[in-house]
Amino acid sequence: MAAPGKLSTCRLPPLPTIREIIKLFRLQATKQLSQNFLLDLRLTDKIVRKAGNLANAYVYEVGPGPGGITRSILNADVAELLVVEKDTRFIPGLQMLSEAAPGKLRIVHGDVLTFKVEKAFSESLKRPWEDDPPNVHIIGNLPFSVSTPLIIKWLENISCRDGPFVYGRTQMTLTFQKEVAERLAANTGSKQRSRLSVMAQYLCNVRHIFTIPGRAFVPKPEVDVGVVHFTPLIQPKIEQPFKLVEKVVQNVFQFRRKYCHRGLGMLFPEAQRLENTGRLLELADIDPTLRPRQLSISHFKSLCEVYRRMCDEDPQLFAYNFREELRQRKIKKKEKQDDAKSYRL
């Protein structure tokens, strides 16, 4: 068995290079899909090494494209690699890899946002949540356009222990724009601290492992790329429903340059806003003049617990959306203006 962090000596037979595959099948990155190809196998090997020991592992790769990371995963001597690719142009090149690694590579033409990976691997791979992570991994060079909605979806799956996490605390090694990678791993108080920081870190151990310069990709993106590793925590740092945590965190960070009481106030209808915001902050023991980036996970834990109690007291509170209240107010204002015009006529 290969040592942790080392690729196995298992190698694929001689194949065209990724650059040759791109020419052979006349592949071009599609701007609409935010596609950027990583051609340097030294870098794809490094991504795979950082995922851990993959010998005899079951790997789910998202968005394989022309197959650069796919090759590195297969060279790690995995038991099985499942790839899900939305763009049909890449399927022939992936089939070439499948033929070079009989029985190892399974190709699905589909959308990672809707694919049911919980049904993809054997039930025997499942482990209790409290055990070590299962021998199942998620790896992917994500298109920029899908990376944020996809990680939020998977974080919710972690919270519910479903989707890819029916197998246990499945580890993920994924690429993001460098700025997004920095936000995911940002500490309390840092300028990069954001909604993503809190949502990821209350559920996972998050590490920004290394950065890949944009020039390593074809076509070259305007930004560098960060590789991030996620290991779900045995016990989440906030034990509340995902949607409730998400709502509190979103409201706080929508006014990221203001004091935290500004965003928290938007959790409540205008008529009770001042009173309820004060009550929330007092019961959670939060300084109302802290900025959003200064709030720790412990602060958010207290806020979510108090907000949950307030929602239990008022069952309609959680459904409240201040943007909808604002929209309705604008509609009523316009109706009054129209009525006034009609009256003058």
Swiss-Prot record:
**What keywords is this UniProt entry annotated with?**
DNA-binding, Methyltransferase, Mitochondrion, RNA-binding, rRNA processing, S-adenosyl-L-methionine, Transcription, Transcription regulation, Transferase, Transit peptide
Q: Which family does it belong to?
A: Belongs to the class I-like SAM-binding methyltransferase superfamily. rRNA adenine N(6)-methyltransferase family. KsgA subfamily.
What GO terms describe the biological role, i.e. biological process, of this protein? rRNA methylation; transcription initiation at mitochondrial promoter
Q: Which domain of life is it from?
A: Eukaryota
Show the transit peptide stretch: 1-27
Q: Give a short account of what the protein does.
A: Mitochondrial methyltransferase which uses S-adenosyl methionine to dimethylate two highly conserved adjacent adenosine residues (A1583 and A1584) within the loop of helix 45 at the 3-prime end of 12S rRNA, thereby regulating the assembly or stability of the small subunit of the mitochondrial ribosome. Also required for basal transcription of mitochondrial DNA, probably via its interaction with POLRMT and TFAM. Stimulates transcription independently of the methyltransferase activity.
Query: Sorted alphabetically, which SUPFAM superfamilies does this protein's record hold?
Result: S-adenosyl-L-methionine-dependent methyltransferases
Bilayer-crossing regions = none
User: Reaction(s) catalyzed by this protein?
Assistant: adenosine(N)/adenosine(N+1) in rRNA + 4 S-adenosyl-L-methionine = N(6)-dimethyladenosine(N)/N(6)-dimethyladenosine(N+1) in rRNA + 4 S-adenosyl-L-homocysteine + 4 H(+)
Q: Which Pfam families does the entry mention?
A: RrnaAD
Note the subunit structure.
Interacts with mitochondrial RNA polymerase POLRMT. Interacts with TFAM. Bound to the maturing mtSSU until the late stages of assembly.
Q: Report the main location listed first in the record.
A: mitochondrion
| Gene symbol of the encoding locus | TFB1M
Q: Which InterPro entries match?
A: KsgA/Erm, rRNA_Ade_diMease-like_C, rRNA_Ade_Mease_Trfase_CS, rRNA_Ade_methylase_Trfase_N, rRNA_adenine_dimethylase, SAM-dependent_MTases_sf
**Localisation:** Mitochondrion
Q: What is its EC number?
A: 2.1.1.-
The EC class name is: transferase
Instruction: Output this protein's name.
Output: Dimethyladenosine transferase 1, mitochondrial
Q: Which GO terms describe its cellular component?
A: mitochondrial nucleoid
- Output the Gene Ontology terms for molecular function: DNA binding; mitochondrial transcription factor activity; RNA binding; rRNA (adenine-N6,N6-)-dimethyltransferase activity; S-adenosyl-L-methionine binding
List residues binding S-adenosyl-L-methionine: 38, 63, 85-86, 111-112, 141
